[in-house]
Amino acid sequence: MKSHTIEFTRDDLVVRITRYPAGEPGKSPSVEIEVESSGLPRSFVWFDREPQLFAFKEMLEEYIETFRPMKDETAL
């Protein structure tokens, strides 16, 4: 099985999510998330267990809810 990458782009923010196959039978696949933006240094997050993905999802939802009101205020 090959790796699979999905890329999302909005304004100057680029997010790439790459899923890598399990290296050995019985092992879980892993996920790498790469974020690029002109205002931030390039960063990577690597997950190799399902609970880590759930924690990241919760963190991402909280981030979106925190910054959505700020974006709406700057659009005025």
Which positions does each model-derived feature cover?
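Positively charged, low-complexity terminal tracts
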Residues: 1-76
